[in-house]
Amino acid sequence: MGQVIDESPTAEPRFKARGVDKHFGPVQALTQVDLDLYPGQITALCGDNGAGKSVLTKCIAGIYEIDHGQFFWEGQPVHVRTPRDAARLGIETVYQDLALADNLDIVQNMFLGRERLRNGFLYEDDMERAASKTLADLRVTTVRSIRQTVASLSGGQRQSVAVAKAVMWNSKLVMLDEPTAALGVVQTKMVLDLVRRLRDRGLAVMMISHNLNDVFEVADRIAVVHLGRMVAQGRASSFDRQSVVDYMTTGASSRSGQQANADGATSGTR
């Protein structure tokens, strides 16, 4: 797994990956990857370009099937071979491109592919109520109308709609791919507040990010991937920015180990 720079929380992880391998022809994308994602915690997944973050995320989301290893969901071994398998467990993903249709309104986007029917017709009133409730629960208050097209929304509003769409389906784990990419200061704050609210609702949250300011702003835990291997994971308080950069670029760091020891945590390899 790499270096464990702290003691694990007492709660059982909602999701665990153990010894996960994934290759594409001769290219080994993931090697013996372990990962723990806990309910009510935000785990920041960090790594340089090509480190394996997106491949790992897509394996958890059911886009790619792992070659070796095992996933566990709430302590039980599971197989995630398709996005439908992931959705059944309660795993939802918000990709960097958001997968929103600009020409459709907010309600239509939130129910795209999962429309509710009544007597063979779209149950518009029910979908509007559900969309409004989800946005209200997440305290998304900046949209003018749930019937405005996504094309008319700001970047932060679009991200909020994509997140609301992900949590609407009884999700228990939400994965966010670079949720603040290309956003301004105000919009970034809005999205990070939204990420915190997901945690406060008891969801397990995994946030892929290159922005270490965002990582240390919201993350409870940090996991770092280097060349397809998980080289470190633990409490965010056991890292500093330089140690994360060291792990991302070289796969090792002495700084986090010193900090972990100062915190009374354990370190080692397993």
Model segments located where?
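Glycine-rich phosphate-binding loops of nucleotide-dependent enzymes
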Residues: 2-270
